[in-house]
């Protein structure tokens, strides 16, 4: 979890499902105490600590009983018994996934031992890049920091481009209905989507000037460094199909003779980049905003 609005909501669902039996039994009490598990188990333990001894011990016993029939949880602090459900920002995608991969796909268990781990990420598209690097490492082994290539990034982020989950355009829908994106100047509805109560609904936007600038930066970086540049864009995602059209258009504004510039879907781009990294070759990644966040942690941590 790293996205201020959307991820804590998903995180709260995970906590409630993992501790389902305890919530079924003590849900009313938790509501009375004002527990909000979107803030993690730390919030729950804090509130439970205020209960009379007998009641507190019963609740804690029921919470701990949930661990008996469940998979072990990756630990943030084995000595203190702090699991990754303690707080939504203890284990975050951009920092924790690379560390886990660098550790051979392992994280710490309750006894302070490294064990194989299953990572569960709250989205589907960019999770695949991590699957790709995990598969690659299973086949090729760990990267060697002495010989591996580097992957500088040019991110699409000007003018709040593709802001994600941490801004004022992400909502938890309160009732069933329709979400519209409306042009305030004309009243025209640009996009409509059916939504249900509890949905997380996000709008993202990119301004034309930001795309133009992004293409220029990528071309300049390629020319100055001599590295190939890969635009990580998937023609099957409607938003990115629009970006691809604009990228191709704005590439014509530059002298790209002799430059190696390609557009690939995220998984292909990751595979292509890793094939070069392992041979000590450098590759520029030109990506949207979320991948800028992920990749600028992933490759430096590996290196």
Q: What is the role of each PLM region?
A:
Residues 1-13, 21-246, 250-303:
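Extended, well-ordered protein cores
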């Amino acid at each position: 979890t790293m996205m201020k609005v959307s991820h804590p909501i998903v995180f709260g669902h995970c906590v409630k499902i993992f501790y389902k039996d305890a919530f079924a039994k003590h849900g009313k009490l938790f509501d009375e105490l004002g527990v909000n598990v979107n803030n993690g188990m730390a919030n729950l333990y804090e509130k439970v600590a205020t209960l009379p001894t007998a009641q507190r011990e019963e609740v804690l016993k029921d919470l701990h009983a949930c661990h008996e029939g469940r998979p072990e949880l990756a630990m943030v602090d084995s000595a203190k018994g702090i699991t990754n459900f303690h707080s939504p920002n203890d284990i975050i995608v951009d920092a924790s996934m690379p560390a886990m991969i660098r550790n051979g796909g392992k994280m710490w268990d309750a006894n302070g031992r490294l064990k194989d781990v299953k990572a569960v990420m709250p989205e589907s598209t960019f999770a695949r890049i991590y699957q790709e690097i995990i598969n690659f490492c299973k086949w090729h082994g760990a990267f060697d920091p002495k010989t591996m290539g580097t992957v500088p990034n040019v991110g699409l982020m000007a003018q709040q481009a593709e802001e994600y989950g941490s801004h004022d355009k992400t909502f938890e829908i309160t009732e069933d209905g329709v979400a519209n994106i409306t042009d305030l100047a004309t009243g025209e509805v640009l996009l409509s989507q059916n939504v249900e109560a509890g949905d997380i609904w996000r709008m993202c936007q990119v301004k034309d000037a930001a795309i133009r600038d992004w293409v220029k930066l990528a071309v300049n970086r390629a020319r100055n460094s001599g590295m190939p540049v890969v635009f990580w864009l998937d023609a099957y995602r409607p938003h990115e199909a629009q970006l691809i059209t604009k990228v191709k258009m704005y590439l014509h504004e530059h002298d790209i003779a002799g430059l190696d510039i390609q557009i690939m879907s995220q998984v292909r781009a990751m595979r292509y980049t890793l094939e070069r990294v392992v041979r000590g070759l450098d590759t520029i990644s030109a990506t949207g905003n979320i991948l800028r966040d992920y990749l600028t942690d992933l490759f430096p941590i590996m290196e």
